[in-house]
């Protein structure tokens, strides 16, 4: 398969702000056009206080900050902005309902053609604030209509992101990746939380019919490796290994189709 356009979203491990593995994968796939919308510190879920979503809608890329605007949903919106013709209102329609981003927030740039591959690797930072604590509420959210998805949990946010992208990019092969294992005292990155996040991502991938790359177990970057190779952010040796692993997973999936 000839991959003309590759688009990725995620956190510091995928982002060019830090590790840049998303762009490394794009180059290995020989993609002619690349949009890496990932940001360091990004969370999968929108931030919230109780049931109130406190994440602002913005098209401005956060500079590797642990802030409420630095979330997957805003990365998706920046992808939509790039796909929307220059100067046009950013619109998309799901279940017969049209959604739009107000022009005062931003308009289309027309800088991206329809992607062949979309890769999303995000969840490591979920839980670093009380406002984005991870929980497996997939069962509660999986049957909700698009308009009812609050994005205040990982499942809801991923379902919203995938359904948005499936609508706007119907021909794209979408891949969700489970998180890498880490070696850190931070509770939200420990094994139990990693496994919880992995379960949510796998369930969303199955529900939406997209592909799942199990980086948690398949990449080789387990807790013992992480201890001496970057703890959270893989060192140069392991960045290469993980990029090779992800590339192989994408290629083997595409060539089977």
Enumerate the language-model features and the residues they cover.
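A general structural detector for well-ordered alpha-helical segments in enzyme core domains, enriched
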Residues: 21, 75, 154-161, 197-201, ...
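Conserved SGNH/GDSL esterase-like catalytic core that processes O-acyl groups on lipids
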Residues: 5-8, 13-137, 143, 147, ...
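A generic secondary-structure signal
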Residues: 82, 160-168, 245, 249
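Soluble non-cytosolic domains of exported or imported proteins
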Residues: 15-19, 145-156, 191-195, 233-240
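Active-site segments of SGNH/GDSL-like serine hydrolases
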Residues: 121-128, 159-196
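Conserved beta-strand segments of alpha/beta enzyme cores
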Residues: 33-35, 173, 209-211
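Catalytic His-Asp segment of secreted/periplasmic serine-dependent ester chemistry enzymes
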Residues: 51-52, 179-257
